[in-house]
């Protein structure tokens, strides 16, 4: 993180840095993986320069990334991808992945079920998708396509297996697509 702030400072970027902690370091020094001061700083400034945060696998505190997404309604994860080096394994790659960040299995409703003497014999998780959130993320993708001169939106789903949970996403995708003449919807 220090390298990034040094470069931005050298470029004359007009930032006043408000350094806050999160993750394992914050847990050890402040007793919370995501201290109130960090959340207050994010809410106040509306900006975060965040590096990777460790999330314990299997046990421990809830993912800070998931908490931040839900706390600040960071519902759209936008990942542009383009071929940079010609002659590589893949040529002419130019796509943008827009992933919904707060519903589905990201709701993180997980539990153990006891069987006999084993309190963790069965692990299960549940997800949910709301019509409103499905509509919002699909609309975001279509608006992104319009603003960036894209010709199509590909909706990736599992409605063949998760007929209700993923089906509502596909249904809303089709409804929103009907409003965008000139853009095609492909679903897989």
Please identify what each model-predicted range represents.
Residues 119, 123-134, 139-164:
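An alpha-beta-alpha
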Residues 14-35:
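N-terminal beta-loop-helix "entrance" segment that forms/cooperates
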Residues 26, 56-57, 160-164:
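Short, small-residue-enriched loops and turns at beta-alpha junctions
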Residues 28-124:
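N-terminal glycine-rich phosphate/adenylate-binding segment common to multiple enzyme folds
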Residues 163-173:
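Short glycine/threonine-rich loop-to-helix capping motif typified by GTGT followed
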Residues 186-188:
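Conserved small/polar residues in nucleotide/adenosyl-binding loops
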Residues 9-14, 175-183:
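Short helix-capping segments at alpha-helix termini
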Residues 1-21:
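N-terminal phosphate-binding or glycine-rich loops at protein starts, especially the Walker A/P-loop
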């Amino acid at each position: 993180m220090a390298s990034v702030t040094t470069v931005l400072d050298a470029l004359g970027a007009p930032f006043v840095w408000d350094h806050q902690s999160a993750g394992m370091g914050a847990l050890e020094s402040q007793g919370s993986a995501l201290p109130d001061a960090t959340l207050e700083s994010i809410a106040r400034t509306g900006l975060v320069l965040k590096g990777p945060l460790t999330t314990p696998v299997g046990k421990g505190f809830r993912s800070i990334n998931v908490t931040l997404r839900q706390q600040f309604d960071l519902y759209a994860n936008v990942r542009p991808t383009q071929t940079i080096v010609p002659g590589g394994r893949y040529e002419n790659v130019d796509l943008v992945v827009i992933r919904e960040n707060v519903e589905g299995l990201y709701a993180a409703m997980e539990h153990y079920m006891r069987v006999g003497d084993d309190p963790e014999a069965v692990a299960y998780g549940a997800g949910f998708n709301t019509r409103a959130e499905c509509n919002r993320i699909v609309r975001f993708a279509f608006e992104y396509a319009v603003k960036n001169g894209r010709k199509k939106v590909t909706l990736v789903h599992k409605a063949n297996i998760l007929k209700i949970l993923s089906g509502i996403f596909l249904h809303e995708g089709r409804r929103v697509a009907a409003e965008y003449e000139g853009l095609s919807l492909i679903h897989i």
